[in-house]
């Protein structure tokens, strides 16, 4: 009995020992997992703290305080099931309370107010269209006697305009006229070179390993192309230059010296300009949905302002004529205010977006494709890219000119051959008529000799 009890108690002691070992092992595993979880939590807390510090450094004053409901309450989501095209339901979650997304506009506005909006413009057009006067008026400068040193000098005007809390870092590049030479086939090159140099500078900084993120964007966002009002439509030289530069910049057509036309003539001229640009497939900047809403009068009709004029106790920016005054700030007399609102308020984001997403991306793709096409290629400087691009464009222009010259030579040669044939025919006819005349005179001579008599003729010495 005792032996049986002893024998029966032996497995229980063995089982008890195994259970204690298992408990010890489980405790060790729990302790190691607890230590691991504590280390993970500390690591996560450090990462979160680091991310919060970076975010706070980047945002600065842009971080807006969340509402009390967002602080005190946890974000709760409501689940809905929306059927898809296959008939299966897809769970969709909607926040039940404020999660801070509605503060994004205020954060963006605060950042823009602190840093300001950078916008770069270039003024292009023929001479004596009031480009420099427009720049001074736009920048609210009284320096109306400023003139560029040379005909093709590029002059940068920089200014900071403010409207309440909003600041505009404005840069306008003045190009003092084209089309003054007898040969204007290459007058577009300085403009295109300047635009390409700015695109290349941005591209070169982008492809560098240690690129400067704080570098100011020098790309041109809009080209104010001044159109000559003397005529019924766009001039061939204006169309030629627009086609050459529309792939590098947003073209904004502007009619200079619009006070030389009546309102009816101006409206008719605007329609003709747009029709010519559409017919010639010139890519000018437009946003149809914004233009209908804001009633944008493209192309803009601009009147230059001279010295300030005092009228009825007010200082007016405009021009004085014998028949009255022209106020450039009056929307009924000039589109100056509409153009300023167009550039600074209604379409500034559209200009910058198209410059970066369309013009620069196309330029960047072409450069990268050309770079990867060369075996063993590496990133080259912007100056070399610019020279290569200009050489390619020059070769294309030379080929086009060679083709045109060959056609003109062939046409001239055909005209000369036709003229030679006409001259030969005329000479043959003249020679035949001359022979007939000689024959007729010989016959008349013989007849006279017979009538007078040979002896009398010989005696008188009439005919030798």
Swiss-Prot record:
Biased composition (Basic and acidic residues): 41-54, 69-81
InterPro entries the UniProt entry points to: G_SEPTIN_dom (IPR030379), P-loop_NTPase (IPR027417), Septin (IPR016491)
Pfam families tied to this protein: Septin
Gene Ontology CC terms, in alphabetical order: cell division site; mating projection septin ring; meiotic septin complex; membrane; microtubule cytoskeleton; nucleus; prospore septin ring; septin complex
Region (Disordered) residue spans: 28-91
SUPFAM superfamilies: P-loop containing nucleoside triphosphate hydrolases (SSF52540)
Binding site for GTP: 125-132, 151, 177, 257-265, 304, 319
Coiled coil ranges: 396-453
Annotated region described as G3 motif, given as residue ranges: 174-177
Disulfide pattern: none
Region (G4 motif): 256-259
Localization of this protein: Nucleus; Forespore membrane
Record membrane topology: Peripheral membrane protein
Entry-linked Gene3D superfamilies: P-loop containing nucleotide triphosphate hydrolases (3.40.50.300)
Alphabetically ordered keywords of this record: Coiled coil, GTP-binding, Meiosis, Membrane, Nucleotide-binding, Nucleus, Sporulation
Region annotation G1 motif: where it falls in the sequence: 125-132
Family stated for the protein in its record: Belongs to the TRAFAC class TrmE-Era-EngA-EngB-Septin-like GTPase superfamily. Septin GTPase family.
PANTHER family, A to Z: SEPTIN
Function recorded in the entry: Septin-like protein involved in the correct orientation of forespore membrane extension during sporulation.
Subunit field text: Component of the sporulation-specific septin complex composed of at least spn2, spn5, spn6 and spn7.
Designated name of the protein: Septin homolog spn5
Organism phylogeny: Eukaryota, Fungi, Dikarya, Ascomycota, Taphrinomycotina
Name of encoding gene: spn5
